[in-house]
């Protein structure tokens, strides 16, 4: 099992190109199931989860062709579902990645049936799919749970409906939106998630011929159409990768230029960084992060749905706050059990106490390298940031989590002065 070795203590200095958003790409890939025309996605990140989704679609009979490699324009994938032969998403693939549930809505909407294994791929508390299923039932789908599978079917077409989500759900919004594009009549989706990845999905669907109003707001109005066409669509920049490398600059008191990204994707994080003492400047085609001349100050955060502070940045923020002046409170309001990185940070000398859904972080003079273990994707990169800031050597075990969400992380950091290498057993 791969490990990552880091010798920390040196400030980062250089340029990192931000890739396409993993969460957007995983949502966009299933749109091919809504049409018999080719769909091309560009600016695609090269990640394990992307390959898993491609394998899942391929097993259903979708033509999948991945191209490109290290080019600055990013990879692209050609998808063709005209020869779809199966509407089952099997356990052996779905268990690796919960985003697999996003094939459910498109399959039912266009093909009238789907059999999808209950998802896996994440160790962050309970992430139920009941809101996905209730939304599809509201559109007329018949849902049964049998032997670990979701069985969904509809006679004829789905029917438009008014759906008000009881709480904001990203995946539920995405599944309902895709299904509604081919439903008969109008669908009103209220209290929807407003993440940039959902805006990206809606813009892609609109380019395919979907009739969607309210993009970027909390209410989406969808007028169903008979068919959708193909399209070519560039995946939105990855705001979580953007934020992670911005925090890497802060953690090491360094300077990084991030290209291929946008300020509007990370405004909440940037606001918190500036309050902590980091200089963030919007430049053409990206951002410049400069933490060289300031002693960072502890700043409280509470995770919230977009446009609030993202839950996927909580662990990384904690790593930075571990060496900031004073104390900070980090409150996790989205997922339960998302402080699994705290014991590992504590092994490196961090002073953190958990009280319910909040963690109190008291900044220390410095962290020390140690043997640590990654428990999930964001905890993995949190430990990378802590190791970059720490004195001495850190070995991070179980980094397969890291490969699910970050492309060539060791190469990008090494190019900016980090002493980092992957150890293969």
Curated annotation (Swiss-Prot):
<keyword id="KW-0808">Transferase</keyword>
<keyword id="KW-0963">Cytoplasm</keyword>
<protein>
    <recommendedName>
        <fullName>UDP-N-acetylglucosamine 1-carboxyvinyltransferase</fullName>
        <ecNumber>2.5.1.7</ecNumber>
    </recommendedName>
</protein>
<keyword id="KW-0132">Cell division</keyword>
<feature type="modified residue" description="2-(S-cysteinyl)pyruvic acid O-phosphothioketal">
    <location>
        <position position="122"/>
    </location>
</feature>
<dbReference type="GO" id="GO:0008360">
    <property type="term" value="P:regulation of cell shape"/>
</dbReference>
<dbReference type="InterPro" id="IPR001986">
    <property type="entry name" value="Enolpyruvate_Tfrase_dom"/>
</dbReference>
<keyword id="KW-0573">Peptidoglycan synthesis</keyword>
<dbReference type="InterPro" id="IPR013792">
    <property type="entry name" value="RNA3'P_cycl/enolpyr_Trfase_a/b"/>
</dbReference>
<dbReference type="GO" id="GO:0071555">
    <property type="term" value="P:cell wall organization"/>
</dbReference>
<keyword id="KW-0670">Pyruvate</keyword>
<dbReference type="InterPro" id="IPR036968">
    <property type="entry name" value="Enolpyruvate_Tfrase_sf"/>
</dbReference>
<comment type="pathway">
    <text>Cell wall biogenesis; peptidoglycan biosynthesis.</text>
</comment>
<feature type="binding site">
    <location>
        <begin position="22"/>
        <end position="23"/>
    </location>
    <ligand>
        <name>phosphoenolpyruvate</name>
    </ligand>
</feature>
<dbReference type="InterPro" id="IPR050068">
    <property type="entry name" value="MurA_subfamily"/>
</dbReference>
<feature type="binding site">
    <location>
        <position position="312"/>
    </location>
    <ligand>
        <name>UDP-N-acetyl-alpha-D-glucosamine</name>
    </ligand>
</feature>
<dbReference type="Pfam" id="PF00275">
    <property type="entry name" value="EPSP_synthase"/>
</dbReference>
<feature type="binding site">
    <location>
        <position position="98"/>
    </location>
    <ligand>
        <name>UDP-N-acetyl-alpha-D-glucosamine</name>
    </ligand>
</feature>
<feature type="active site" description="Proton donor">
    <location>
        <position position="122"/>
    </location>
</feature>
<keyword id="KW-0133">Cell shape</keyword>
<dbReference type="GO" id="GO:0009252">
    <property type="term" value="P:peptidoglycan biosynthetic process"/>
</dbReference>
<dbReference type="GO" id="GO:0019277">
    <property type="term" value="P:UDP-N-acetylgalactosamine biosynthetic process"/>
</dbReference>
<dbReference type="GO" id="GO:0008760">
    <property type="term" value="F:UDP-N-acetylglucosamine 1-carboxyvinyltransferase activity"/>
</dbReference>
<feature type="binding site">
    <location>
        <position position="334"/>
    </location>
    <ligand>
        <name>UDP-N-acetyl-alpha-D-glucosamine</name>
    </ligand>
</feature>
<keyword id="KW-0131">Cell cycle</keyword>
<dbReference type="InterPro" id="IPR005750">
    <property type="entry name" value="UDP_GlcNAc_COvinyl_MurA"/>
</dbReference>
<keyword id="KW-0961">Cell wall biogenesis/degradation</keyword>
<comment type="similarity">
    <text>Belongs to the EPSP synthase family. MurA subfamily.</text>
</comment>
<dbReference type="GO" id="GO:0051301">
    <property type="term" value="P:cell division"/>
</dbReference>
<feature type="binding site">
    <location>
        <begin position="127"/>
        <end position="131"/>
    </location>
    <ligand>
        <name>UDP-N-acetyl-alpha-D-glucosamine</name>
    </ligand>
</feature>
<comment type="function">
    <text>Cell wall formation. Adds enolpyruvyl to UDP-N-acetylglucosamine.</text>
</comment>
<dbReference type="GO" id="GO:0005737">
    <property type="term" value="C:cytoplasm"/>
</dbReference>
